[in-house]
Amino acid sequence: MVFDAAHDAGPIVLAVGGRHVVAVVCTHGHNDHVTVAPQLSEALDAPVLLHPADDVLWRMTHPDKDFRTVNDGDTLRVAGHELRAIHTPGHSPGSVCWHAPELNAVFSGDTLFEGGPGATGRSYSDFPTILTSISEKLGTLPGETVVYTGHGDSTTIGDEIVHYDEWVA
């Protein structure tokens, strides 16, 4: 599984080596997360996965390329571990985090970072919606769950959710 194929397919293909890639997963449709997804899909013979609510964003970068839809609760099996899609709108309408309970991890894209929620100043973003996604979806995960973010350092659910009231204020 490759998350958020953004800038240059070559180094990603080299890092994958000869391993089988189940999917090229886009946590959301902003261009900095999807730029080389079709190219990687072709090079790795793996489908691009994206939530359908981000179709409008996808089409801004890839008007003639299709993707396979992923919805809340969908699962993928990767290297013997199950990952479950959690639809977390707010940063974009189709933002999706991927929870791997056996690995005690969640891949949050731009929904949650060390220090708080993802930015909501971009088109199709909404601050109250991202707060709801974090509190009702990510906030229910165990506190020790490691959050691998779309940009920057990792954190944990517990380290972030304690600041929820500050974000709302």
What residue ranges belong to the model's regions?
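Conserved beta-strand hairpin/beta-sheet module of binuclear metal-dependent hydrolase folds
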Residues: 1-19, 97-109
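Metallo-beta-lactamase
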Residues: 64, 82, 87, 93-169
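Active-site neighborhood of phospho(di)ester-bond hydrolases with catalytic His/Asp-centered motifs
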Residues: 2-3, 22-29, 37, 48-52, ...
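Active-site HxH/HxHxD metal-binding segment of metal-dependent hydrolases
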Residues: 7-82, 162-166
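Short, flexible active-site loop motifs that bind/organize anionic cofactors or intermediates
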Residues: 2, 45, 120
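Short beta->alpha junction loops/turns
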Residues: 5-8, 30, 123, 153
